A protein has these predicted regions:
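A beta-strand-loop signature enriched in Asp, Gly, Thr, and Trp
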Residues: 9-15, 40-44
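Functionally critical mobile loop/hinge segments
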Residues: 23, 32-135
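Glycine/charged-rich beta-loop-alpha catalytic/anionic-binding loops adjacent to active sites
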Residues: 2-12, 56-60
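Active-site nucleophile and cofactor-binding loops and adjacent substrate-binding regions
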Residues: 11-22, 67
Length: 135
C-alpha cells in the first residue's frame, strides 16, 4: 500500500523513478515485520524519501536494476535509522513535519517539478548520440 500511496500523488508518467516508491514500500513492510507500528513505519518512509527522492527514470535501461537496488537500500537504511532513533525532520531538505506532508512535497516535486526533466530525458533518448555504445 505504501508504494501505491506514494505513486498516486506522482501520477502515471513522471521523470521520477518509480523504484523509489517501491523501496519505501519495502522498507515500510520490513519495519512492520519487525514489529513496527504506524510511527515507526512513517519514520522509515520519511527517511527513505529523504535519502533517495531525487532519482530520475531514464527509460528502464540497464541502469534500472542498480536504481532498484539503491531504492531498496534506502528503504532498509531508513528502517535502520528509525530503529536507532535517528530520523530526518521537517526542514531537512524536502522533508516536512509528518509523513503525509513529506509525501505531498515529494509528489509535487515529482509531478510538477520534474515536468521539464521528463521532456529533456525524452529529447536525450531520441536524439542520435555520437559514440552512444561506448564510454
Amino acid at each position: 500500500e505504501t508504494a501505491i500511496h506514494l505513486k498516486t500523488g506522482i501520477g502515471p508518467l513522471s521523470a521520477y523513478c518509480g523504484a523509489t516508491s517501491a523501496g519505501c514500500g519495502a522498507g515500510a513492510g520490513i519495519t512492520y515485520l519487525h514489529g513496527g507500528r504506524y510511527n515507526e513505519i512513517a519514520h522509515t518512509v520519511v527517511n527513505a524519501l529523504a535519502i533517495n527522492s531525487g532519482m530520475v527514470c531514464d527509460g528502464a535501461k540497464a541502469s534500472c536494476a542498480a536504481k532498484i537496488a539503491s531504492a531498496v537500500e534506502a528503504g532498509l537504511l531508513g528502517m535502520q535509522m528509525q530503529m536507532h532513533d535517528s530520523e530526518f525532520v521537517g526542514g531537512d531538505g524536502i522533508v516536512l513535519k509528518g509523513v503525509e506532508n513529506t509525501i505531498r512535497n515529494v509528489s509535487k516535486m515529482a509531478h510538477d517539478g520534474m515536468a521539464e526533466t521528463d521532456r529533456e530525458i525524452i529529447r536525450l533518448m531520441i536524439a542520435p548520440q555520437e559514440g552512444a555504445a561506448s564510454c
